[in-house]
Regions:
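Amphipathic alpha-helical hairpins
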Residues: 1-121
Length: 121
């Protein structure tokens, strides 16, 4: 992965023009975390451990990404990159489970993270 200019990320993190976008991304990450945690518990009861692992991984990266933005971490761009990739993968898993709400939450989060990465690059 190409190393990003973390100094530029820190400057952009406090730029008033992107604060609203970051707030939206934080909310999307937290929503995706909650949806994936909820689905993981239901999926565990249904006996699909391979799906549970993906849902839990997605929930974890979403929460970590939200926290990195909340504390204005210089590394939040890296978190957003990882979150975008994991959420995209998880959305596909949710599609195979027939869970449109979970897939939509994952895709919304992935899109928000992708927008943050574009803005800070």
């Amino acid at each position: 992965m190409k190393q990003q200019n973390t100094g530029n990320m820190a400057q952009n993190a406090v730029n008033p023009m992107i604060l609203g976008q970051m707030r939206d991304c934080i909310n999307d990450c937290l929503n995706c975390h909650n949806v994936c945690m909820d689905r993981a518990m239901g999926t565990l009861a249904a006996g699909k451990p391979e799906h549970v692992k993906v849902l839990l991984d997605c929930a974890e990266i979403c929460l970590a990404t939200a926290h990195s933005m909340m504390r204005s971490s210089q590394l939040h761009g890296y978190f957003c990159n990882a979150c975008q990739a994991v959420c995209t993968h998880c959305a596909g898993i949710c599609d195979t489970m027939g869970d449109r709400d979970c897939a939509n939450a994952c895709r919304t989060c992935a899109t928000s993270c992708q927008q943050i990465v574009k803005m800070i690059s």
